[in-house]
Regions:
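Residues at secondary-structure transition points
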Residues: 4, 36-40, 44, 102, ...
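Generic N-terminal initiation segments characterized by hydrophobic and/or small/turn-forming residues
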Residues: 6-9, 43, 79
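Membrane-proximal N-terminal amphipathic helix
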Residues: 35-62
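Conserved hydrophobic beta-strand within the GNAT/NAT acetyltransferase core sheet
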Residues: 9-12, 53, 111
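N-terminal single-pass transmembrane signal-anchor helix
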Residues: 1-34
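Periplasmic/extracellular, small/polar-rich flexible segments of pilin-like filament-forming proteins
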Residues: 58-157
Length: 157
């Protein structure tokens, strides 16, 4: 009797089906993990910018004016290299001031999800103001404070 070696078509199809099931479970979990890690990076950049603005405020007593008498703006964020997340490579968040919200007494920074991260429908926008209030939204509208569920969920993860 001849001893055959190899796989039958049925064994191959079962293996492919099992791999398909594993991939269908693993990929969404990975994408969710990657989106959450990019959220963390965006929040860190917002807080870094806020620290720089606050250090400047201690000198000038004016959020809008820098120590060299120039005005703080979205262009300044670009000069600092903090206008996108990450600062090099594929952009996941665009950092800017909300509708030129910066003035002498305050500001609101926003991180808007772009590119691949725009698929993260739960936390499309992060906001941070001069008082350290952390907000998030699924739209470009700044929430009223940080007590809403979206803000609490997005800043916690």
């Amino acid at each position: 009797m001849k001893n055959n070696k190899g796989f039958t078509l049925l064994e191959l199809m079962i293996t492919i089906a099992i791999m398909g099931i594993v991939v269908s479970i693993a990929l969404p979990a990975y994408y969710n993990y990657a989106a959450r890690s990019r959220r963390v990076e965006a929040r860190q950049v917002l807080q870094t910018i806020a620290q720089q603005i606050d250090q400047n405020y201690r000198v000038t007593r004016n959020y809008k004016q820098l120590a060299d008498k120039s005005e703080l703006s979205d262009a300044t964020l670009a000069l600092w290299g903090l206008d996108k997340v990450p600062t090099a490579g594929n952009e996941y968040y665009k950092i800017s001031f909300v509708n030129n919200s910066i003035n002498e007494s305050g500001y609101i920074l926003q991180a808007q999800a772009v590119g691949v991260q725009a698929g993260d429908k739960d936390c499309l926008y992060f906001f941070y103001d001069q008082s350290g209030v952390k907000m998030a939204s699924t739209t470009a509208t700044v929430p009223n404070g940080s007590r809403d569920q979206v803000s609490q969920t997005c800043w916690a993860k």
